[in-house]
Curated annotation (Swiss-Prot):
Enzyme Commission (EC) number: 2.1.1.-
Sample GO molecular function, one term: 23S rRNA (adenine(1618)-N(6))-methyltransferase activity
Transferase is among the record's keywords: yes
Provenance organism: Methanocaldococcus jannaschii (strain ATCC 43067 / DSM 2661 / JAL-1 / JCM 10045 / NBRC 100440)
SUPFAM superfamilies per the UniProt record, alphabetical: S-adenosyl-L-methionine-dependent methyltransferases (SSF53335)
Name the record gives this protein: Putative methyltransferase MJ0046
UniProt keyword terms in alphabetical order: Methyltransferase, Transferase
């Protein structure tokens, strides 16, 4: 099983020691402390994936292993479809650019990534430069795909995103929210179930896919209704749908893949 035990992590990063405590005979880290979470995830990325990534103090701190498993599941589907050197678009790469970096590091792909927050764009570019990888970062200016000048006339084998998924009535800014301290734009997907932004990716993305291209979205377990709506939308635009499950610790995530025939 892919992972990094706490006792091993502190051997690689001594900064973690101040966040470690014992519960029974096991070492624990208080991951509610954002600085502890940042240091641990930086260590995981370096030790397991040889990536040197900095995290923005005001941004969402992604879980590296479930992002990797998300990518792995998606690229297994691409391989089954006979796509070996895909052109990839990530929607909403965030300040870490972790999904795009993992794709570029481990797969033979041409990678484009969008982000709306200008501060996060600068941060993502620094992470990309630090790892000496070629990823094209684009300011989406609040758009999903359509209307982004840099994407005009482009086609992709994969459009991938872990989109914002909280409902329009949720309040995200300035507080701990759903286990995350992050900016509103990273969390609020809109719609009754948080499905609205995912709908945009699907409705617009279908026109930017090559034949056999895939739209791959990751979603949490609850609410089930959100997943049902996203699957229904994929089918409405003519995509064949596959759903995989991945689990890291107690977190269950669903990978919803829409395939263009």
């Amino acid at each position: 099983m892919l992972g990094l035990k706490i006792e091993d992590a502190i051997k690689y990063n001594e900064k973690l020691k101040k966040y470690v405590y014992k519960k029974g005979d096991k070492l624990r880290i208080n991951f509610k402390d954002k600085e502890a979470l940042i240091e641990y995830n930086k260590t995981v990325l370096k030790v397991l994936f040889d990536l040197d990534i900095e995290f923005h103090k005001n941004g969402l701190i992604p879980t590296p292993i479930n992002r990797y498993l998300f990518i792995k599941s998606t690229f297994e589907t691409l391989k089954e479809l006979g796509i070996e050197k895909p052109t990839v678009l990530e929607i909403g790469t965030g300040h870490s650019a972790i999904i795009s970096l993992l794709i570029k590091k481990f797969y033979n792909a041409e990678v484009y990534a969008t982000e709306v927050d200008e501060e996060f764009i600068d941060f993502a570019k620094r992470n990309i430069e630090k790892n000496k990888l070629d990823i094209k970062i684009i300011n989406s200016k609040g758009r999903a795909i359509e209307g982004i000048e840099e994407l005009k006339d482009k086609k992709f084998d994969l459009i991938i995103s872990y989109p914002p998924f909280y409902s329009k009535n949720s309040v995200a800014s300035g507080r701990k929210f759903g286990g995350a301290l992050a900016k509103n734009v990273e969390l609020i997907g809109g719609g009754k179930f948080g499905e609205e932004f995912s709908f945009k990716i699907i409705e617009e993305g279908i026109n930017f896919l090559n034949k056999k291209g895939v739209i791959s979205l990751m979603m949490p377990k609850k609410p089930e209704k959100r997943r049902e709506l996203i699957i229904k939308k994929m089918k409405e635009v003519g995509l064949d749908v596959e759903v995989d499950e991945i689990k890291t610790g107690n977190r269950l995530r669903y990978i919803i893949k829409g395939i263009k025939g």
